[in-house]
């Protein structure tokens, strides 16, 4: 992992294949509002991101909430497979997939079930196919496919319904596949098999795959959390979470109807007390000291790394398991010793596996002992790079000049933080799903993450297509119209540095074709594809909203990134060589 070119994306916004769109609408359970249930629809891929659909209007959902958590565009794993030639043409050699596990959220950073891929990414209704995937009868983390388990019911069955947990009765605590937390009961669903097929195809094309690991918390619909809501303090899963009060809990009994059980579940969620990540009751925190919880996550890790064939291939390009993990908010786990144990599991699955952590700031304490993470998402590299090339204040307000000497000094200091091997494999990112788009940051005086999350546009952030800043520039101290250098030129300068510095360059999906936007959710628009014709976008900024312009992929920028990646690959000194600064002056 010293020489990858990373690409980050999630299936939901990358490419829609449309094989199951109508079935998705029919099956998807959005329980926000009874009115919305009858109106739910997939948002048009090529629409203006700011437009509301009928179901959003009827449900009276605030637009920013809907954009972040509720609306769906229908991107799927088949779409990723279809675009593997595109990734290969660009020069990508590793992909970080945003969460793929079962979740009703569009971003899936709160999982309902880590055992399985979300049906909206795979298939909504089963087909009876195995997608060319072989499953070992000796696999300790699932030795059967859904076809063997369901028999004649393996065709045209609802995968969503099969994954629902039984809250009462003789099958209490099991889903439609008969699974429990015991890995010997686990089954490979059709969506799981589709995911494995995509992994294998990416590997065949020289592209490694890392999953997003979100192990600090689950969604409030995770099956173990729901079992606690159903059973109360008697539940064997109670200690998996941080519950503190069951005083007003009502136990779900076998004599309750399904509707009564559901209503009790909802009331229990309101009445019991538990810790939620960052105060969100929709994201209950795990008790990471609990051994059964740890074993569950360790077995999840083994399932997806070893793959259905249960062996580590000598050649990773022939392997059917993932190659590593990107860890979400790993510093939030109360039990930091969890990561030491988890690392041993990962490295026992694959010797050349890769573990990168979402850590902001100096993370030497988590990297340098070699017993937690291999490396980091290098936000500190991005911060210094932006400070020099964009000359942007970290506190907001007017731009200031970060001198060349200061730029070099910051880089030099940050290179001392980690061992050289960790530096070489650190993800030098130009942005992510948590930041505003780099292209948009260039034309703004304040970075999106410097403002209250979700409030950038209200506070004057300009989210117009950046190449139009020379015509329209209300929120910048630079007069783009009357200077020779343009936002795209600065973007290209940054890309040159990114592709020639120590570390693993990482592109956020669509940056290579000039995608723009403020931070979440506006940095998470559907991918711009050259073959699609998009509706015009109305500037979503809260100033001069009347500006309307085309949405289109920038082919010139794609070719630019393609050329730079090729240069990096053909010159190993850019990957393995030492970095030395040559300072001219600070003018």
Can you say where each PLM-predicted feature lies in the sequence?
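N-terminal structural segment of carbohydrate-active enzymes
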Residues: 1-200, 204-208, 223, 295, ...
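Short, solvent-exposed turn/loop segments enriched in Gly/Ser/Thr/Pro and often Arg
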Residues: 1-2, 96-107, 213-222, 328-333, ...
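Glycan-binding loop/region signatures in secreted carbohydrate-active enzymes
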Residues: 3-68, 223-295, 449-479
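Loop/helix patches that line or flank the sugar-binding groove of alpha-linked glycan CAZymes
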Residues: 4, 8-32, 37-53, 361, ...
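Aromatic- and acidic-residue-enriched segments that line the glycan-binding/catalytic groove
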Residues: 6-22, 27, 105-129, 141, ...
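Conserved, mostly hydrophobic/aromatic
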Residues: 87, 97, 114, 202, ...
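Polysaccharide-binding and catalytic clefts of secreted carbohydrate-active enzymes
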Residues: 100, 165-167, 180, 228-346, ...
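Active-site-proximal helices and loops of the catalytic beta/alpha 8
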Residues: 198-199, 203-207, 216-217, 225-232, ...
